[in-house]
Swiss-Prot record:
It comes from Influenza A virus (strain A/Duck/Hokkaido/8/1980 H3N8). The gene is PB1. InterPro entries: RNA-dir_pol_NSvirus (IPR007099), RNA_pol_PB1_influenza (IPR001407). Belongs to the influenza viruses polymerase PB1 family. GO terms for cellular component: host cell cytoplasm; host cell nucleus. This is RNA-directed RNA polymerase catalytic subunit. Residues 249-256 are annotated as: Promoter-binding site. GO terms for molecular function: nucleotide binding; RNA binding; RNA-directed RNA polymerase activity.
Length: 757
């Protein structure tokens, strides 16, 4: 019998059918090759939006800079960055008037954070531009390198461990006439292999000292490295994103702390909350507008889109905002917060790797690094690239482009949200002084605008007024990409609203499945994803049960761990069958050891080991949870781990899952090919860093680990901790006198070695 698919929807309210429109099967697109072209696009576009501004030259670096602020008034329809300082300041003043004390309180909260934050805050985050090596590194390594260079140049305030003191060093480093850095390089030589008698290339890694004069150092300190944004769906063209270096990071962190504190107090802000909390916040604003539009008023909502939000924002505006927000605060605090926008007004964009050329006839490939773009003959390039390079040439210095206007992606999300909300705030009747009024939601560059008025003309007038007010602060609402609807149906940050937010379960589909970390983590993540979707995304019990069965099937195929009594033959089936036969309590075997699945939708919150513990044979328990098992490279697992899950839309999300350490929590070994490259020195530094941190955590289990106060080093802290613990253990009879004496002796030896060093 044929089924007419429309019958499926007869009983379903229209808004619930959204999950059937899922377009994102398959992998998202990734970028290959260099991001140089995309970065040049960004730089050129940003300058084009501000082209009527005034040019000036930076006295320290010699970089040409364009300043569009307080220049010509913006025009209708054309996106531009011509923000007017007095308009921004006025918007801030009205925001404060409607929220008395908001800036004052946020400043006090931030001041406390500034005084307490440790420098290790900067180790969070992925890739960071490492100015000492002039390329990207993991954040922790980049920070370690920066501090190492600072100390060897006599900058030692950072030793207190406070972030604010590290920032003092950053400020001082910019006044120095020169900075000495250590760079890694590699030498290649051809040598004859003794065994095979063939010629092979041998690489050796060296470190060499290099001096940077003030100008070169400043350029590096102000550089944002650029990469291509990966895995963006629904776009034909890729685009560039930026990673700032360690000099900028700390200052940005404090500014964003202040802005976050303000956003938390603004009902129209979609940041910093997320998920259900965000939905509740937004639903409140909509409810307010709908209740207030009594029978006499019309209410319309614009699902908004802004043209090139980042490229039209201007750091000088952010400086004005901060100056206003902190106007009654102590001088030191105002200075710390104004440095980030000042650095951004003088930023340089690194053009990335450059271009790759290949000659088909001569089978040659050659890389043109970004540094050479300033004076290479343009006849080698195609039309579009030639135009880009010609346009960007006046801005180039040492392979970086001077980029004063614009913000680069994702740098001041919170602060730009404050700016957006300040315009939404102006929609109250006491400010519009007419019959129309507006309110809305803002989350970084995404917005929804709700306009109420007695008639259609009023709605139109309200939208126009909002559009033009935005223009005055450098926000360009796109008339082409925004659409208007009766209030009750709109989209905001991929949440779809139709008489309430609709659960769009299909957006979570890509995060179902086996993650590929290890058997233990994958099982845990898989069931947690299903559990979370039952809680947050209307995943019904029947569908969840089906998802669970599909997941278990997927898991068994991935790890080739079909049940011990199955007929399926795989590489592992011989071993698993043997285990199955010699196990008394078969229900106790983990799924990854060929056991049965005991999960159902009621017990997804229990880790599998705990679920089956009582059912396990004793010797199986002993093998499974044995930290001394020599075949396991064990990582110590906190009771909660974080996994990165990929929804179809938006950024990768971090999700917590329960982790029980068993012999299945193995870590794959690192690829060996890295050991022969110039990365090797860096890798060794990184491993040492890791080892020190792990050792430190052994001495200070997280329960008792308070942030160190004062200036004792890690070694001193560990030695004194060891002595205290040993004394307690000795006095309570947990260790013998000989052991106690030995520990004390080791501690003294360590101190002696430190003194000699």
């Amino acid at each position: 019998m044929d089924v007419n698919p429309t019958l499926l929807f007869l009983k379903v309210p229209a808004q619930n059918a959204i999950s059937t429109t899922f377009p994102y099967t398959g992998d998202p697109p990734y970028s290959h090759g260099t991001g140089t072209g995309y970065t040049m696009d960004t730089v050129n576009r940003t300058h084009q939006y501000s082209e009527k501004g005034k040019w000036a030259t930076n006295t320290e670096t010699g970089a040409p800079q364009l300043n569009p602020i307080d220049g010509p008034l913006p025009e209708d329809n054309e996106p531009s960055g011509y923000a007017q300082t007095d308009c921004v300041l006025e918007a801030m003043a009205f925001l404060e008037e409607s929220h008395p004390g908001i800036f004052e309180n946020s400043c006090l909260e931030t001041m406390e954070v500034v005084q307490q934050t440790r420098v290790d805050k900067l180790t969070q985050g992925r890739q960071t531009y490492d100015w000492t090596l002039n390329r990207n590194q993991p954040a922790a390594t980049a920070l370690a390198n920066t501090i190492e260079v600072f100390r060897s140049n006599g900058l030692t305030a950072n030793e207190s461990g406070r972030l604010i003191d590290f920032l003092k060093d950053v400020m001082e480093s910019m006044d120095k006439e020169e900075m000495e850095i250590t760079t890694h390089f590699q030498r290649k030589r051809r040598v004859r292999d003794n065994m095979t008698k063939k010629m092979v290339t041998q690489r050796t890694i060296g470190k060499k000292k290099q001096r940077l004069n003030k100008r070169s150092y400043l350029i590096r300190a102000l550089t944002l490295n650029t990469m291509t944004k990966d895995a963006e769906r629904g776009k034909l063209k890729r685009r560039a994103i930026a990673t700032p270096g360690m000099q900028i990071r700390g200052f940005v962190y404090f500014v964003e702390t202040l802005a976050r504190s303000i956003c938390e107090k603004l009902e129209q802000s979609g940041l910093p909350v997320g998920g259900n909390e965000k939905k509740a916040k937004l639903a409140n604003v909509v409810r307010k507008m709908m209740t207030n539009s009594q029978d006499t008023e019309l209410s319309f909502t614009i699902t908004g889109d802004n043209t090139k939000w980042n490229e039209n924002q201007n750091p000088r505006m952010f400086l004005a905002m901060i100056t206003y927000i902190t106007r009654n605060q102590p001088e030191w605090f105002r200075n710390v917060l104004s440095i980030a926008p000042i650095m951004f007004s003088n930023k340089m964009a690194r053009l990335g790797k450059g271009y790759m050329f290949e000659s088909k006839s001569m089978k040659l490939r050659t890389q043109i690094p970004a540094e050479m773009l300033a004076n290479i003959d343009l006849k080698y390039f195609n039309e579009s690239t030639r135009k880009k390079i010609e346009k960007i040439r006046p801005l180039l210095i040492d392979g970086t482009a001077s980029l004063s206007p614009g913000m680069m992606m994702g740098m001041f999300n919170m602060l730009s949200t404050v700016l957006g909300v300040s315009i939404l705030n102006l929609g109250q009747k006491r400010y519009t002084k007419t019959t129309y009024w507006w309110d809305g939601l803002q989350s970084s560059d995404d917005f929804a605008l709700i306009v109420n008025a007695p008639n259609h003309e009023g709605i139109q007038a309200g939208v126009d007024r909002f559009y033009r007010t935005c223009k005055l602060v450098g926000i360009n609402m796109s008339k082409k990409k925004s659409y208007i609807n009766r209030t009750g149906t709109f989209e905001f940050t991929s949440f779809f609203y139709r008489y309430g937010f609709v659960a769009n379960f299909s957006m979570e589909l890509p995060s179902f499945g086996v993650s590929g970390i290890n058997e233990s983590a994958d099982m845990s993540i898989g069931v947690t994803v299903i559990k979370n979707n039952m809680i947050n995304n209307d995943l019904g019990p029947a569908t969840a049960q089906m998802a669970l069965q599909l997941f278990i099937k997927d898991y068994r195929y991935t790890y080739r761990c079909h049940r011990g009594d199955t007929q399926i033959q795989t590489r592992r089936s011989f071993e698993l069958k043997k285990l199955w036969e010699q196990t008394r309590s078969k229900a106790g075997l983990l799924v990854s050891d060929g056991g049965p699945n005991l999960y159902n939708i009621r017990n997804l919150h229990i880790p599998e080991v705990c679920l089956k513990w009582e059912l396990m044979d004793e010797d199986y328990q002993g093998r499974l949870c044995n930290p001394l098992n020599p075949f396991v490279s064990h990582k110590e697992i906190e009771s909660v781990n974080n996994a990165v899950v990929m929804p179809a839309h938006g950024p990768a999300k971090s999700m917590e899952y329960d982790a029980v350490a068993t012999t299945h929590s193995w870590i794959p070994k690192r690829n060996r090919s890295i050991l022969n490259t110039s990365q090797r020195g860096i890798l060794e530094d990184e491993q040492m860093y890791q080892k020190c941190c792990n050792l430190f955590e052994k001495f200070f289990p997280s329960s008792s680990y308070r942030r160190p106060v004062g200036i004792s080093s890690m070694v001193e802290a560990m030695v004194s901790r060891a002595r205290i613990d040993a004394r307690i253990d000795f006095e309570s009879g947990r260790i013998k006198k000989e052991e106690f004496a030995e520990i004390m002796k080791i501690c003294s030896t360590i101190e002696e070695l430190r003194r000699q060093k």
